Amino acid sequence: MQMNKLLGTCLLCAWAWGQQANAQESIKVGDTTRNMITYAPEGLPYNPPLVISLHGLNQDANYQKGQANWEAVADTAKFVVVYPNGVNKAWDISGDTDIKFLETIIDTMYNRYHIDRNRVYLSGFSMGGMMTYHAMARMSDKIAAFGPVSGIPVDYRNPSGGRAVPVIHTHGTADNVVYYNGDANHPDGGYGSIPDYVKKWAAFDGCNMTPE
């Protein structure tokens, strides 16, 4: 009888866990409650990778989830995906607020799924791409590789970890918000071209400056 109760409890817990594989949830970051969407595919192995995907300005986690659709890859490659929500649909791209949020996400996913801390990846669109660059400078010791999309570094600094940082930057040449060729007259002080930023990272990483 006790064994049947135990088995029933285990089955119930497993069912409940499965229902939360694609869940909106809240976590505490210091004294603040932050929100995110977490996706964990069935059959997740021990020590899986983690992908964190950041939305753009005036967007949210639901929108980013629909656009990025990491689940289509996660289902076969077996990794965890987190879509965080920025405060007021924006990111702190120069301070510590969202750096702490990202660190807490990584710790939470480690405690829950025992994710591989050496295979944590960060990507983001537009302002989320800017936050990705900010994280490259501040927490390259905690994130293995970065994939900014249509974003720029607002405060260019070399990574804190002192290592070559794998990065793939995706940007449309016809982008009419964050211009591919830069904008010297931008109200916030102007910014350079995307190729110039990429060359800086390539130089830091010790890459051959002539593309193969």
Q: Where are the regions that the model predicts?
A:
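A domain-start/cap signature at the N-terminus of enzymes
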Residues: 19-50, 62, 73-76, 80, ...
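Short beta-strand/loop motif that positions the catalytic acidic residue
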Residues: 169-171
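Conserved alpha/beta-hydrolase
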Residues: 78-88
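Structural cue for short, hydrophobic secondary-structure segments
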Residues: 53-56, 83
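Active-site-adjacent alpha-helix of alpha/beta-hydrolase-fold enzymes
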Residues: 173-212
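Bacterial Sec-dependent N-terminal signal peptides
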Residues: 1-24
